[in-house]
Amino acid sequence: MKRLLLITLAMLSYIINCNAVVVKSPVDYVNPLVGTASKRELSTGNTYPAIALPWAMNFWTAQTGKMGDGWTYVYGADKIRGIKQTHQPSPWINDYGQFAFMPITGKKVFDEEGRASWFSHKAETATPYYYKVYLADYDATVELSPTSRAASVRITYPTTNEAYFLVDAFDKGSSVTILPDKRTIVGYTTKNSGGVPDNFKNYFILRFDHDFVYKGCLSDGKLIDNQLSATCNHAMAVVGFQTKRGEQINVQVASSFISEEQAFRNLKEVEGKSFEQVKAEGKAEWNKVLGRIEVEDDNVDHLRTFYSCLYRSVLFPRSFYEFDAEGKPIHYSPYNGKVLEGYLFTDTGYWDTFRSLFPLLNLIYPSMNEKMQAGLVNAYRESGFLPEWASPGHRDCMVGNNSASVVADAYIKGLRGYDIETLWKAVVHGANAVHPTISSTGRKGFEYYNRLGYVPYNVGINESVARTLEYAYDDWCIYQLGLKLRKSAKELQPFKERAMNYKNVFDKETCLMRGRNADGSFQKPFNPYKWGDAFTEGNSWHYTWSVFHDPSGLAQLMGGYDKFNTMLDSVFNLPPVFDDTYYGFTIHEIREMQIMHMGNYAHGNQPIQHMIYLYDYSGQPWKVQYWIREVMNRLYTAQPDGYCGDEDNGQTSAWYVFSALGFYPVCPGSTQYMIGTPYFHKAKIHLENGKTITICAENNNDDNRYIQLITMDGQPYPHYYLEHDKLKKGVSLNFMMGERKPI
């Protein structure tokens, strides 16, 4: 009877799967507008449509916000001020090296308010490799297809003798020069939001395929006809054409952080290529990268959400290197202002991305992360510290020393080809020092932490419990890396011991993490719903679970797994109450938790994103399967409001990618992934070594979210974790799904 039931289920699964969509061109399922329906008070991603190649040096976006506004593109806007080259990782960090262009017809009105044109999303096309928009006020259409350091632009003008093309180099010091004989505009911008040396510039070049019938420059808002150059606080260049309806002006654009000469060299990425060729090559590159994961499903919306998240997972960290005349990688250093050999990457905050973004790279795109690790070697050599938030240089943002996790996870999972000994020195140094001017780099409060075993609450160092918990985990990562490198027991002993420091801020009375004073007493009064204060963008209910490396030890502190599970349950059962007095207002992360109707679970921010998977450790995997499916169903879509908080440079997207595949790296630095619940009927992960991970979920639908049986390569698999080394060899995982939790 049981065998007959299994055969029947298998036949039903086959019938259902016959309706599954087989994805042939994954980039066609990407919506770059996901997360753009955001504002300062409420984030649905805080993204912009990044028109770019994977890990490109330059991104492009339509600009709806004012110059310098971190919300550069907002879905609810109805006017476009320009098409901007951007390097912005988030609205909170803001942009650097940005400039914009704008087609205009009729009157010579070039300030950003006056030139802004109405547009409609119905006349807008946004893909990762191609952007098109109709500028209604000018009856003109803009198209753009990018490469990593250049782009091909095509403008379709109406019939007019006043077809203008504006280049806005923005304020804070800029320069433009028009070269009529070469049909070219060159210039530079110095605009930035910090993290750069005094000699920072982004040099740009624009080359046209039509002669200029008008030339002019604006110096700080004043237009001078026939002026061919301007160097001032805010420089702009304007060239004009006489066009017939449907006539197209082609522009090739490139830039460099190194020099104008290097910008011309970078222009070779599009030289000699038609617009359609650049567009086709961009699409092919995206399909190559996204196609590393094939998924099949009968729900097209699931496919769109998945590939939109995978797209966000392969944008950052951005390349910050270029190629010299001999084809060797070189970079302008945002740490010391020199042009040096080698790779460099930037625009990521490890507080966010150590959790699942870098583990995703290590599994699916390891050769890219090997370059990133080589870039970290250079960052350390050039600044004396590994970055914790880089954009493009060190930025004072967030807490923790999580570069240690990024370094350890890569090496432990087999990445090679870079100077690991220098990175070892870097992580050890960063664990015992703080940057002299950027307090989030290194470890603020390390003296207290090393001596007392925690960062005290009452010594003037904010977010002390968050720091303690993250330092303890980072010490564990350093210890694991040291074991892999066969460092001496004496050298490793401090890190081994300090990995248990999380216990020093655990309050047995409340079973929660709590601020602790220098004399050993716990902070009073204590409100576990209070955001900030001893924690970073969260409260004690969120941060208590930040013991990635020792969930079993945390459970024992609580009194055992029964209490552990009760505490986990409480996160969802509690009302979404909060105390925002530390900030003096309700920060957007609080509001996002409040409105999602999931109790005190705050998936819109990173500290708690791994928490659901902790049920695997405590013997209740069906709760993982229930809640992971709830999060994927309710908190992610492929719409402009598709995230439940900041997307954060690939982290929140990588969470979805892993979770939809059915497993997740709870503890980067270890070799294990915890099993969740597969979202798709079938998925294939094509590894760089030529092996394939095949994941099949029979009888899978929203009701049948519970795993009844797992087999690996045809044999029953009794565990709720997967080993990295086993996955690298290629495996076939089969999940039999059902509507009831297994007994």
Task: For the regions a language model picked out, list residue spans one by one.
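Bacterial Sec-dependent N-terminal signal peptides
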Residues: 1-22
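Accessory carbohydrate-recognition regions in carbohydrate-active enzymes
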Residues: 21-358, 362-405, 411-469, 477, ...
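ATP-dependent phospho-/nucleotidyl transfer catalytic cores
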Residues: 474
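Extracellular attachment/recognition segments
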Residues: 706
